[in-house]
């Protein structure tokens, strides 16, 4: 585990894009990221986050690199801090099937930005060019390179995981609480046995194939 000093240095290193934007005259820099582009079931969720200038949040990193315990701690820390501005966007399975997952992801991001308390004047977006009235910078692997995007990734991931746990209560046979809708061996087996439920993405190949094979609830 990294020391406090090492974590603080890492936070500063990953603030380079935010600092550059501020040097260019921007003041409300929001990181934007998504969770749930790849799963076979459940919504796609986006997070947006504006971190206060001059405040260090130890441990902030790409949500995929954190343990569930670390991620939950940071999620609650970000939400409970009155100086942190967080927004969430959620796009349904029906909408994903209607417009495709890429466009649905962009819609979720726009929703997340709109749900922020303040209006950002610059966006740092993980991996996507986002058509938006606010100027933006696409950053490849941004969740590992920008603290604002990393914070947004934590918000999106934890929020979506909570939604999938709720879906598990409704459809326990699929194991949504464990794989969160991703195409694990156990999920594919359940899909083959039970067929898709209303929360499966019917435009995604394994789900589409199960429908074509005539497996239905």
Swiss-Prot record:
* Cofactor(s) listed: Mn(2+); Mg(2+)
How many cofactor units bind, and how? Answer: Manganese or magnesium. Binds 1 divalent metal ion per monomer in the absence of substrate. May bind a second metal ion after substrate binding.
Give the CC-aspect GO terms.
cytoplasm; ribonuclease H2 complex
All copies of domain RNase H type-2, residue ranges: 27-216
Quote the catalytic activity from the record: Endonucleolytic cleavage to 5'-phosphomonoester
Q: Does the keyword Cell inner membrane apply?
A: no
Q: Write the Enzyme Commission number(s) for this entry.
A: 3.1.26.4
Report the subcellular localization. Answer: Cytoplasm
Task: Classify the source by domain of life.
Answer: Bacteria
The record's section on Pfam families has: RNase_HII
Binding-site residues for a divalent metal cation, renumbered to this chain: 33-34, 126
Q: Which UniProt keywords apply?
A: Cytoplasm, Endonuclease, Hydrolase, Manganese, Metal-binding, Nuclease
A biological process term (GO) from this entry: mismatch repair
PROSITE patterns found in the cross-reference section: RNASE_H_2
The family line of this record is: Belongs to the RNase HII family.
- Report the protein's function: Endonuclease that specifically degrades the RNA of RNA-DNA hybrids.
Name of the protein described by the UniProt record: Ribonuclease HII
Q: What is the scientific name of the source organism?
A: Chlamydia trachomatis serovar D (strain ATCC VR-885 / DSM 19411 / UW-3/Cx)
Gene field: rnhB
